[in-house]
A protein has these predicted regions:
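Multi-bladed beta-propeller domains
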Residues: 19-57, 85-103, 133-149, 169-171, ...
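Blade-terminus and WD-like Trp-Asp/Gly-His loop motifs, strongest in beta-propeller folds
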Residues: 60-69, 76, 105-115, 153-161, ...
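Serine-hydrolase catalytic core recognition
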Residues: 334-421
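Short glycine/acidic-enriched loop and turn motifs that connect beta-strands
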Residues: 76-79, 121-126, 167-172, 213-216, ...
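Boundary at the C-terminal end of the N-terminal hydrophobic targeting segment
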Residues: 15-17
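Sec-dependent N-terminal signal peptides
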Residues: 4-13
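A generic tandem-repeat structural signature
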Residues: 110-173
């Protein structure tokens, strides 16, 4: 009997030990994340998900001075870096090699400069610095102090100076500075808030700057380079949300986007001489998300957000008549920029079957050319579902748009509802 009791104690002790070990095994820690009673992920599921995490994309950054090549951003390895490509679907040549992702990538128009501006931080600290990469020397130069937060504002039209925002004055407010590549910099003004440089005037004597308050409120000012004097653009008692702004190539006016007195953010033009504001896209009842102007000022291209689908328009600036362009796949368009030849328009296009690639629209030939074809982790994009645009009535009678992804296989299937406000 004692032997049985002793054996019972041993068995129960073993079971209790295993139970304790199992209980401990259900609690795991990964950094600040503590998981309890979460089952381990099967290896086969990890392998399937890994293919999706290895999907790459490419985004357009800028054309080279001669317009024969372009600078793009894509990820090889862990972070997004800058690459150069010289023909459609050509081999990408990596230029930057950093542990941190790289932003910017803007060439100067100064023919004596063979390089571009870019930005990056260190170790994810979000203290972005401005650098210049010189192709002749094959190396980069730090242009900011290495300690503060900075943002590139673009080159002057003559390509000798560049503007940038920095909080170097007090560590909080982002003010505007201009500098050359030798470090001769100048602070244009000292104001509270977050300011960014939007565009240089044709004669490089003024910079258009914007102070961002919120998604519904922002202000734009003209700043004189010589003395830093500021003049607010379009003073109003109403709260206005401004998007981008660009001086017309003839120097006679300003193209800009705003939602002033309208439900949508329209593309507008302000005439410096007559002081008149005109709405270019008054017949388009959607937000204008971005625009660009050809170097000769002949064309203006812009993108609207129409039920969450991007639509590209190209107009002649002399009469705002539409220019016929080739059809684009349905998706999200960004990064518009005309080639120096004034005929080709580069853009980044994200579609349901492609995570993001670069296309070029030839306006004269009405032809669309794909310049990059990003890897999709070995997946077959023929199996990707193209969603359909649907509209449903909300509780207040308004129509709400959405995208419905229908599985290609027979159901029943689980349903995922993702709300974007």
């Amino acid at each position: 009997m004692r032997k049985l009791i002793f054996l019972f104690i041993i068995i129960n002790s073993f079971v209790f030990t295993q139970w304790v070990q199992n209980e401990r095994a259900t609690k795991t820690t990964a950094g600040n994340l503590v998981m309890e009673n979460v089952p381990s992920i099967p290896v086969e599921i990890k392998e399937k998900s890994r293919r999706y995490s290895n999907i790459r994309s490419a985004s357009f950054r800028s054309w080279t001075q001669d317009g024969k090549e372009m600078l793009i951003a894509t990820r090889f390895g862990e972070t997004t870096q800058l690459h150069k490509i010289n023909q459609p679907l050509g081999q990408r040549k990596q230029i930057t090699f950093y542990d941190e992702p790289v932003g910017g990538g803007y060439f100067s128009k100064d023919k004596t400069k063979n390089g571009f501006l870019f930005s990056k931080d260190t170790g994810g600290n979000e203290y972005w610095q401005v650098y210049y990469y010189d192709f002749n020397q094959g190396k980069e130069t730090l242009l900011t102090d290495g300690k503060t937060r900075n943002s590139i504002g673009g080159w002057s039209n003559n390509g000798k100076l560049f503007a940038f925002s920095s909080n170097k004055e007090n560590g909080v407010d982002m003010n505007i500075f201009i500098s050359d590549l030798k470090g001769n910099e100048k602070q244009l003004f000292s104001e509270k808030g977050s300011w960014s440089a939007i565009d240089w005037s044709v004669d490089d004597k003024r910079i258009l700057v914007r102070r961002y308050i919120s998604i519904n409120e922002s202000y734009m000012h003209f700043v004189n380079i010589e003395d830093g004097k500021m003049n607010q653009f379009n003073q109003s008692k109403d709260k206005i949300s401004y998007g981008s702004g660009k001086f017309s190539k003839d120097g006679n006016g300003l193209y800009y986007t705003s939602d002033e007195s309208t439900e949508f953010r329209h593309l507008r033009y302000y005439d410096f001489k007559s002081k008149n504001h005109s709405i270019i896209t008054k017949d388009i009842k959607w937000d204008v998300r971005g625009f660009t102007i050809s170097e000769n000022g002949k064309y203006i291209a812009f993108v609207t957000n129409e039920d969450a689908i991007s639509k590209l328009y190209v107009l002649k600036t002399k009469d705002y008549k539409s220019v016929k362009i080739p059809s684009l796949p349905i998706g999200q368009i960004s990064g518009l920029k005309f080639n120096p030849d004034n005929n080709r328009l580069a853009l980044t296009l994200n579609t349901p079957k492609s995570p993001g690639d670069i296309y070029v629209v030839n306006i004269k030939k009405r032809m669309l050319t794909q310049w990059t074809e990003s890897e999709i982790g070995g997946l077959n994009n023929d199996q990707f579902v193209v969603p359909e645009l649907v509209h449903v009535n909300s509780f207040d009678g308004l129509k709400v748009s959405g995208f419905l992804y229908r599985p290609k296989t027979k159901g029943p299937h689980p349903v995922i509802i993702s709300i974007h406000g």
